[in-house]
Amino acid sequence: MIRKATKNDLARIAEIQVFNYRLYFYPIFRTDEYFFGELQVPSLMREYESRLDSLYVYDDGVVRGFIMIEGTYIARLFVEPVCQNAAIGSALLEYAVAEHHADHLWVLEKNTKAMRFYERHGFAATGEKKPEEGTAEYLLLMKRGGR
């Protein structure tokens, strides 16, 4: 069910990210220009085309989620909003840990739902944080085992 992404998956990957950003991040950032102007499927497809080597999808006949793994860093993990709470995110995260030894990620400080998800999978906030570029928000570093 989890496989390396192909060029044919790019539209679906981008669509999943757009849906998630608008649903979960727009209420925090409230930037119409970005969320309804710049954040578009075609531009994300172009961005991801050069990163296919780090993209993996959960595919059970339909691509329902994806994860981007760069070395041991989890750069992105998104599941189609209508498919959440069905163990898809867990499967993607467990794959990253088992197959790529993924052990760290940055999470938006106000994204408590994501933080709880990662905590359930053995990740813990390290106390290190950095500003989210161009915003007043912060990202928190989470590591597996809190190392």
Indicate residue ranges for each PLM-predicted region.
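A short beta-loop-alpha structural element at the N-terminal edge
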Residues: 1-15
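Conserved beta-hairpin
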Residues: 52-67
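Conserved GNAT acetyl-CoA-binding A-motif
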Residues: 98-110
